[in-house]
């Protein structure tokens, strides 16, 4: 059961998205929190005061070395715990699994280079100790899991999974299996990533002159155009030609039904299954457009328990990449047949930017909120649906009424990795 959701995502008006109400206010309107400065990007404007208000008392010896990833991951965790009415500092999570998904390494680079460039012959002892603490906390992908484990004083499983943009989706599957087999009663899953705007700008400049060379080496299973970041992302729109990135963190609290019932927790819904597949190509950067392995992941999730005709909504994973839209459309046709035209399938990546590892947790949180509200959020920035869509992308800026008990949420990783999560209302 999902009993708590918390966020540290780009917002509007200088305030991050932190709570379920904040998230719904943005997603239900199809609003975009992306800002343009050479490239479009979703920034989390988390002030020191906001952080200190939610996380007082952390020893400065550790906190002054926190990266943005640490800060975002800790804030989304305490927001999710507050939503679930659990106190991470009073032992409520002492036996919980604290699981983190991380896709990128941008937040780790500065600490890594600081140690690499330090001169042991001239550095002072106190400065050397500061570098050591910063490095221990920040140079590996386990950075956020380390500080979350410390905050909660957890004695349970505590580790990081890196599967690109499917990282937290994979961790949700692991958490579900841990709870189902009785290993833990509570699992807290966070997806967090930070993307360097400087790096994105430099990539954009490098790629501007590289298209002709790329045309000469590309294979049929690679997109015809190199990525672009300088126009607004429009998933499922006929004008889609760009991907925008964003930073941030999303945390969900998962519990066994018995544990949640004993303490009278609010139930958003449940994670019924999760499956991961790969396209099987020899090219490490490509994916195929038939969607066959996405179909396989969905069918593993459904099993004999749920029929596809019982799933009227899918939270799509499109980031504006036309290849992603193509394999999603083909997969939907294979799964739903003539019923595909009635399927509602939307993406809110245009609200916050493509944020990597948080996407799995964000998809679950958004979908369960839609289920609870009985409304499907529109696809952000989609105004003119693409011609090749086999489903209804819910264009515009208004929600669509839908009473539903089952849904799917999709996430992908570069190289053809596909994740599908089957979600249900609390009582199914």
Where are these regions (language model features)?
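Condensing-enzyme catalytic core mediating Claisen C-C bond formation in acyl metabolism
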Residues: 1-12, 16, 20-25, 31-37, ...
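Short beta-strand segments
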Residues: 4-6, 99-101, 162, 187-193, ...
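Glycine/charged-rich beta-loop-alpha catalytic/anionic-binding loops adjacent to active sites
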Residues: 54-61, 123-134, 151-161, 231-238, ...
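Active-site nucleophile and cofactor-binding loops and adjacent substrate-binding regions
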Residues: 65-70, 91-93, 128-140, 159-168, ...
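Claisen-condensing/thiolase-fold acyl-transfer catalytic domains that form or cleave C-C bonds
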Residues: 165-180, 242-246, 250-265, 279-428
């Amino acid at each position: 059961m999902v009993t708590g959701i918390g966020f540290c995502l780009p917002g509007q008006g200088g305030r991050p998205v932190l709570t379920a109400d904040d998230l719904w206010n943005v997603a239900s309107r199809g609003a975009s929190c992306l800002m343009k400065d050479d490239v479009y990007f979703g920034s989390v404007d988390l002030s020191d005061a906001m952080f200190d208000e939610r996380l007082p008392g952390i020893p400065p010896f550790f906190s002054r070395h926190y990266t943005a990833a640490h800060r975002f991951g800790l804030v989304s965790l305490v927001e999710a715990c507050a939503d679930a009415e659990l106190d991470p500092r009073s032992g409520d999570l002492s036996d919980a699994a604290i699981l983190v998904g991380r896709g990128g390494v941008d937040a780790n680079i500065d600490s890594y280079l600081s140690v690499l460039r330090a001169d042991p012959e001239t550095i002072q002892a106190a400065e050397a100790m500061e570098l050591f603490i910063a490095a221990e906390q920040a140079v590996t992908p386990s950075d956020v899991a380390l500080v979350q484990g410390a905050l909660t004083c957890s004695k349970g499983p505590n580790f990081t999974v890196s599967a690109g943009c499917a990282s937290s989706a994979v961790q949700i599957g692991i958490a579900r299996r841990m709870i189902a087999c009785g290993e833990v009663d509570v699992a807290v899953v966070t997806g967090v990533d930070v993307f360097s705007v400087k790096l994105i700008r430099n990539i954009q400049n490098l790629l501007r002159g590289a298209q002709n060379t790329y045309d000469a080496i590309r294979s049929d299973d690679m997109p015809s155009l190199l990525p672009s970041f300088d126009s607004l992302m429009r998933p499922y729109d006929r004008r889609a030609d760009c991907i925008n990135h964003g930073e941030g963190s999303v945390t969900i609290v998962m519990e066994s039904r018995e544990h949640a019932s004993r303490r009278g927790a609010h139930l958003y819904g449940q994670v019924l299954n999760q499956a991961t597949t790969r396209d099987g190509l020899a090219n490490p950067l490509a994916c195929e457009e038939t969607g066959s392995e996405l179909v396989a992941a969905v069918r593993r999730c459904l099993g004999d328990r749920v029929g596809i005709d019982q799933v009227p909504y899918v939270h799509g994973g499109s980031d504006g990449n036309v290849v992603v839209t193509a394999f999603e459309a083909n997969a939907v046709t294979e799964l739903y047949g003539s019923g595909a035209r009635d399927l509602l399938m939307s993406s809110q990546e245009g609200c916050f930017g493509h944020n990597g590892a948080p996407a799995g947790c964000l998809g679950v949180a958004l979908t369960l909120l839609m289920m609870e509200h009985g409304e499907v959020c529109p696809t952000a920035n989609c105004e003119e649906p693409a011609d090749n869509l086999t489903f209804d992308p819910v264009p515009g800026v208004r929600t669509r009424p839908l009473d539903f008990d089952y849904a799917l949420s999709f996430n992908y990783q570069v190289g053809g990795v596909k994740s599908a999560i089957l979600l249900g209302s609390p009582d199914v």
